[in-house]
Swiss-Prot record:
Enzyme Commission designation: 1.1.1.37
CDD domains according to UniProt: LDH-like_MDH
Residues annotated to bind NAD(+): 9-14, 33, 95, 118-120
Lineage, uppermost ranks: Bacteria, Bacillati, Chloroflexota, Chloroflexia, Chloroflexales
Segments forming a coiled coil: none
Name used for this protein in its record: Malate dehydrogenase
Annotated Pfam families: Ldh_1_C (PF02866), Ldh_1_N (PF00056)
Residues annotated as binding substrate: 82, 88, 120, 151
The family this protein is said to belong to: Belongs to the LDH/MDH superfamily. MDH type 3 family.
InterPro entries found in the cross-reference section: L-lactate/malate_DH, Lactate/malate_DH_C, Lactate/malate_DH_N, Lactate_DH/Glyco_Ohase_4_C, Malate_DH_type3, NAD(P)-bd_dom_sf
Catalyzed reaction equations: (S)-malate + NAD(+) = oxaloacetate + NADH + H(+)
GO MF term set: L-lactate dehydrogenase activity; L-malate dehydrogenase (NAD+) activity
Length: 309
């Protein structure tokens, strides 16, 4: 029997993730949305791409969570984007309500699933998903670092004039302006990135990475990134379903790692069939650790706001 992947939210990120999951034949896909006709239409359209692209999986579009029962993976992309004039607290409130609704309906139907959160504010919504689902920490994980690291690697490749495939990089922290790219753990085919790029240019790349999502929002005017976020999500899905033991930066629940507790935070981890199989603690220097603590303070503040609601 093929694995079953349920995607909650049939917007750009959800439907694009569904496409790549189908094209890789990672499993059968259930696309869920509250808007009648949207998941059904997108699901049917995607199904009809199968004979052309050469994939053969079952794709179901529905408004009914019953169709998600016994999923191996649940991906949550549903959420409102931050609008002009909207406070951080307003965004947390709106998306917390959506997340509670999605998880409370989906999790009981798939008690052995791994939940991958994609909605924002990412670290806070992942924390909420763990609370609502009651799942163990290894089976609730947030997609942020894979995307942010991909942006970082892209900008480094552009600057160095080399293939993006040869960039190895690591990034930590919350999904936002306080993220922590780590140049000391960044190489080009094993060669330190500083052999290719000056500190000044590297600092500019780090700042562009931090603002990467906003740069695309500003260019699009209406909407936000979806190709790279969905590709990042599918990379995590593949690592879990194929038990690849990938070392990827993900939002993981910490209990003492890096001196942090009761927080979802972007750290390198081993991702496999058990979900987050272990968190890797890098030997950070004082400067890097200070940036991690600053990022953790921002995430903790957001989680504290959630708890007060």
């Amino acid at each position: 029997m093929r694995p079953k992947i349920s995607i909650i939210g049939a917007g750009f990120v959800g439907s694009t993730a569904a496409h790549w999951i189908a094209s890789k034949e990672l499993g059968d896909v259930v696309l869920v949305d509250i808007i009648d006709g949207v998941p059904q239409g997108k699901g049917l359209d995607l199904l009809q791409a199968g004979p052309i692209e050469g994939f053969d999986v079952k794709i179901t579009g529905t408004n009914d969570y019953a169709a998600t029962a016994n999923s191996d993976i649940i991906i949550v992309t549903s959420g409102a984007p931050r609008k002009p004039g909207m406070s951080r607290e307003d965004l947390i409130r709106v998306n917390a309500d959506i997340t509670r609704d999605c998880i409370s309906k989906a999790a009981p139907l798939s008690p052995d699933a791994v939940i991958i959160m994609v909605n924002n504010p990412l670290d806070t919504m992942t924390y909420l998903a763990k609370q609502v689902s009651g799942f163990p920490k290894n089976r609730v994980v947030g997609q942020a670092g894979v995307l942010d690291t991909a942006r970082y690697r892209t900008f480094i490749a552009m600057e160095a004039g080399v293939s993006v495939e040869d960039i190895q990089a690591m990034l930590m922290g919350g999904h936002g302006d306080e993220m922590v790219p780590l140049p000391r753990f960044t190489t080009i085919s094993g060669i330190p990135v500083t052999e290719f790029i000056s500190k000044e240019r590297l600092d500019a790349i780090i700042e562009r990475t931090r603002k990467g999502g906003g740069e695309i929002v500003n260019l699009l005017k209406t909407g936000s990134a979806y190709y790279a976020p969905s590709a990042a999500t599918v990379q995590m899905v593949e690592a879990i379903l194929r038990d690849k033991k990938r070392v990827l930066p993900c939002a993981c629940y910490l209990e003492g790692e890096y001196g942090l507790n009761d927080i979802y935070f972007g750290v390198p981890c081993v991702l496999g069939a058990g979900g987050v199989e272990r968190v890797l603690e890098l030997p950070l220097n004082d400067e890097e650790m200070a940036l991690v603590r600053k990022s953790a303070e921002a995430v903790s503040s957001s989680i504290a706001t959630l708890k007060q609601m």
